[in-house]
Amino acid sequence: MSAAMAVAQTSIDDYCVIGARGGQWLTPQNTQALHRTAVNWLDAELSRPFAGQTVVVTHFAPHGGCVAPQHTNSDLSPYFVTDLSGLMEKHRIALWCHGHTHTNNDFEAENGCRVISNQRGYPGEVERSGFQPDLVITI
């Protein structure tokens, strides 16, 4: 188990309150495997031809620029953010909306993809999250 996974196992509530198959608790290894499956599925779906711009909406953040300030250089960063900039470039994604980090961002990644989140967060986080209830995104 990597250092980041070990820290997540002991620091993230999900790993002591969410059950997995077989009556076991959810583990970082479970979420890593689920993530790999989801990314493979997303890559395959994005490979299907269609007309128009590509917009992706995910729970987890797709780019290092999404790391919340309190998690910069933290072993917990991989729990909140995974670098999927390769998918952004490969599929020429115009916009990627995400959640999970409880902080908001709006920036253009180096591959031209706009990455945005507008998260309300848990009760009590609205005041400090920067949540914009009237936000409209134009593509």
Language model segments and positions:
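Hydrophobic "anchor" residues on beta-strands that sit immediately upstream
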Residues: V55, L95-W96
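Binuclear metal-dependent phosphoesterase catalytic core
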Residues: A68, S74-A94, H102-I139
